[in-house]
Amino acid sequence: MAKSETVRNAERLVEVMMKGNDASHDAAHAFRVRDLALSLAHEEALGLSSSPISLEIVELAALLHDIGDYKYLKNPSEEKIVEDFLVKEGIDIDKSSKILDIIKQMGFKEEINGASNGSQSHTLEFGVVQDADRLDAIGAIGIARCFTFGGSRNRVLHDPNIHPRLDLSKHQYMNKDEQTTVNHFHEKLLKLKDLMKTKAGKRRAEKRHKFMEEFLTEFYEEWTGKA
């Protein structure tokens, strides 16, 4: 199916706004999440059970989800870039509201300590977009992204004396300076499999989760000189 002009404009906005980010949160990440979200949507029969509007909501939310990410925010005004873009593109208020709600509520920090994702957690559009973003955070690509982000922040690779933080608060999670790169697996990435919202997301997460577990086993053996 041919891309709409709005989708092409969204892609261009993503390329411009994420150009200065490290490779863990660059335009390629947004495009992978979009492709995953649409794939999950089709697997969940979203395009068959709902109108094409649902797929447009999924695609735009997935593409635009990391614009204005707090980790890369240079100016508070950037938080309104997506909203302004949707207005400029003539997206109706109902559709725009759904897209913005998905983006606002899909982050891991919003779900820490059992916090609710609100009404959006019950929509399939929300589920496939959030699952797609989380799938890109685990598995082989997730491992690569984790170490890329850690390196960009000069984070310690691993320190056996620094243990993963249990029962993280939202504030603690957002304080990236307190993490080591390997501990991020235990504090977030290994939890994502059980937080998937869709059946399709759960199925795909199993393989990626297993790959991370195998990687960490090998990592610890090499770190301690056993391998």
Language-model segments: which ranges?
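An active-site-proximal "capping" alpha-helix that borders the catalytic cofactor pocket
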Residues: V33, S77-E89
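Acidic/histidine metal-binding catalytic segments
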Residues: A45-L60, G90-Q105, A140
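His-Asp-centered metal-binding catalytic motifs of divalent-metal-dependent phosphohydrolases/nucleases
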Residues: I53-L73, E78, V82, L100-E110
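Generic N-terminal amphipathic, Lys/Arg-enriched alpha-helix
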Residues: N9-G20
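N-terminal glycine-rich anion-binding loops that anchor highly charged ligand groups
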Residues: A2-E11, I53-E56
